[in-house]
Amino acid sequence: MHGRKIAVPWGIFGSGNIGDEAMLQGFAELVKRDTEQPIRVWVASRNPAHVSRVVPSFKYFRSKGTVGSVHRWAMRYADAYLIVGDTPVMDYLGPWPLTDIEKIVKNAKARKKRIACLGVGTEHLSGERSVRRLTERIAPVVEHWTVRTENDKVRLAHYGVDQRRVTVAADLGWLVPPVDTSFGMRWLDHLERRGDTPLIGVNLTHDRWSLDLLPELPSLIARVLDSMINRSGAHVMLFANEVREGQGFDSTGIQEVLTRANRADHMFAIPNRYWRPQEAMSFVACCSVTLTMRYHFAIFSALQGVPFVSLSRLGKLKDLCTDLGWSHELSLEDANSSDVESLLGRALESRDHLSAALRQKRQAMVRRAGLNVRSLDRVLD
């Protein structure tokens, strides 16, 4: 028996965001649970060599935003298509990614392939053209949506998606099991980090959107970390969860903070490598608390039971904190150094209690993430 064939044609994986591969690992766990018959999965990727090391159970074809011969072959012979993970419904960066999704959906319709969205997020759409693209060309064709939060379902309803086609699940990253600290500790020992003081893990972005909301972002983070070091003797681990280089990415934000900090002697940056999710999570597990602007760095913290403070630039981080009943969150546009420092200080002081609460909540989120199987089942029934 050759089994059923799924194409995952939206080629976000391998782009440089460690969270993407966490979602792909979660998807692989869902596929593995289906024991009726084998499922073969072909995944579009910007970096097949890296992604195949992270999730070796799938087949990969290179995608750079265009449809090549292998891409066309996979889409022709697959039984169904899935849009897996990330946030395909958004337009704050412009027409992408909805333009990609529209092309995939159009292809599915032309080839009479079933298509669903699995484990996806949404944001408010600001452009009328984006709204029409979703309501008129995408929503009528997509057979089912499993989404991260109730707010995602509300947004889809606002854009005319039939609510019977939507299941509230959770991010696929919740299906990645926690790890121990051994990998992270080996690196921290190599970097000569003292083990007898609190360790604050920091992940920040440096994209245009964030700087428009808070132009003094690097200076604010530097002031907060200086104060936390003076107050508690903490060390600071700066980590890029998005490893691409350039003005808009995490590594630039890290350097901007280090340049502005007075206590850079207590700060160190983890080498900017394309770490596997388990390696990133091991670094997080070594931390006392974390400060994050990225969605999956927050999930990594929650998975590891490490209290985090969220600087939310978009709806998905706010939605995550709401789901977790988590009050250590600030909107980026409203953030000031006093409030950020206060939240970090409270998280550090109450970390044992908060860690236990996160571990308890993790169990519920893992169960919810399992509901993503409904989109898989829908296209294969």
Question: Language-model features: where?
Answer:
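Active-site anion-handling motifs in enzyme catalytic cores
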Residues: 1-381
